[in-house]
Amino acid sequence: RQGVTIAPLQGISEVKIKKNKDGTDYLSVSIAGPMRSAGGTESAVTLLIADHVRKIAGLSKFQANSFDDETGRFVEELRIYEREASSFQFHILDEDIEHVISNLPVELAGVDTDPYEVVNHKGMTRIQTDRVRGGALRVLNDGLIGRSKKLLKRIEMYNLDGWEWLGDLKGAVQTGDNQEDAAAKRMREVITGRSVLSMPNKLGGFRLRYGRACNTGFAA
């Protein structure tokens, strides 16, 4: 098994019980940062676990506030982070962001991680910062949406209900028209000093694998 570079449980900074507009209680999970995008499926599973805990505790589902436009806040925040702070593993559509925030049974919150503020969605009632929340955005972008198809398999395996709406997402969007475009984009994002051994999906390309496995002789 290949290594996972996110520790989702350590990435949780706080768990709260908060109030919906109708007075019902819901569960809010605050994600810390910074976090890397590798292991996005595992980071998204954190919210599946949180939803299971919510059901056991008898809490209501999270209801996104329309009067505060919490869905619009996530769209603006993610695009600012993408433009000013750091890139994501996948590019996703605005409509997918809105669909996820509108249907999440638990609140995806987070601490601010970068000195960039939203412009149109400041001073919101249930969001305590105007700055971008990198950890929460990575769970949303590269976990819930970018790996929605893999997540649906986990949901089926765990026999969970209430997450069927993930099947309506378009998921990760391929931005390159051909392999040359995709390769050029990856090369632009390579950190100076890092060697490039092979491009993804290259037939016969060199790839490092970490961890214990019989075929490497490190199975003890």
Regions found by a protein language model. Name each.
Residues 1-220:
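Extended, Lys/Arg-rich, non-catalytic nucleic-acid recognition/anchoring regions
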